[in-house]
From Swiss-Prot:
S-adenosyl-L-methionine binds at T76, R80, E111, D133, N188, V189, R206, N207. Residues 1-262 form the CheR-type methyltransferase domain. It comes from Campylobacter jejuni subsp. jejuni serotype O:23/36 (strain 81-176). This is Chemotaxis protein methyltransferase. Keywords: Chemotaxis, Methyltransferase, S-adenosyl-L-methionine, Transferase. Its EC number is 2.1.1.80. The lineage of its organism: Bacteria, Pseudomonadati, Campylobacterota, Epsilonproteobacteria, Campylobacterales.
């Protein structure tokens, strides 16, 4: 029987600090749940104790990625918060030009493909959607575009027939011929690579900011502002609290709330 690797209070706090520095995510409120889940994760890291794990985490690039994958696992599904997705597409269509959209984080691709699906239904062809995430496993799943089960539950049968290819094992694979250009990249919003992604008309950052501390939120707003085109829009999740900054103004419209680049 393998010995459990249990972190001390100080070690757990150090782990939370490292994750915050790497990603902006604040896990302080999830400390108790984290302590319970960490042991199983540590079994696959080939470390003798938590102190050794922390040492490796600071220098081992692969372990950093595996750890980020571990702490950023979340549930998502097609057409989540549908009213807001429709508003994004309504605004995109009103621009009457090629529209670039960034989905950050994109998780396993459901949000990106949902936007592309809605764009196709609204006869929008000249659109580019880039999905980014710091979790390498979900990025690979998004690129594959293969889904089954609960994540598809909000799609109609006609949508499945048009936008997916069904296999005998009940998996549904995205039919990319029916959609606009959708791409996915492994990217941390706080790293230099983010600044080189290009310019966007719309950023959908839903249900990520809720996990950031105040300082990280402010930093993120500045970075979003930098890659948005003039009058570009930021759409966030219902639970995301956005600090007041010089970069965006909050707009209340009949179709919902969004943040416009100042």
């Amino acid at each position: 029987m393998e010995k459990k690797i249990t972190p001390s209070e100080l070690e757990l706090n150090e782990f939370i600090k490292i994750i915050n520095e790497m990603s902006g995510i604040d896990l302080t409120d999830k400390k108790n749940i984290l302590a319970l889940k960490l042991n199983k994760f540590l079994e696959g890291t080939n470390t003798k104790n938590f102190s050794e794990f922390l040492g490796k985490l600071k220098s081992n690039r692969q372990l950093k990625q595996e750890t980020l994958d571990f702490v950023t696992i979340g549930e998502t599904y097609f057409l989540r918060e549908l009213a807001q997705l429709k508003e994004i597409i309504y605004y995109a269509k009103s621009l009457e030009k090629r529209v670039n959209i960034l989905s950050a984080p994109c998780s396993s691709g459901e949000e990106v493909y949902s936007l592309a699906l809605l764009a196709a239904q609204n006869f929008i062809k000249d659109m580019y959607i880039l999905g980014i995430d710091i979790n390498s496993s979900v990025i690979e799943k998004a690129k594959l575009g293969k889904y089954q089960g609960r994540t598809l539950q909000r799609l109609s049968e006609s949508e499945k027939r048009r936008f997916f290819l069904e296999s005998e094992d009940k998996f549904y694979t995205i039919n990319k011929n029916e959609l606009c250009t959708c791409k996915f990249e492994l990217c941390n919003v706080f790293e230099e690579k983010f600044s080189r992604l290009g310019k966007f008309d719309i950023i959908a950052s839903r249900n990520m900011i809720i996990y950031f501390d105040h300082e990280s939120k402010l930093k993120l707003m500045e970075r979003f502002h930098r890659i948005l085109n003039d009058k570009g829009r930021l759409y966030v999740g219902n639970a995301d609290l956005i600090p007041e900054t010089i970069y965006f103004k909050k707009i209340f419209s009949p179709r919902g709330v969004y943040y416009e680049k100042v």
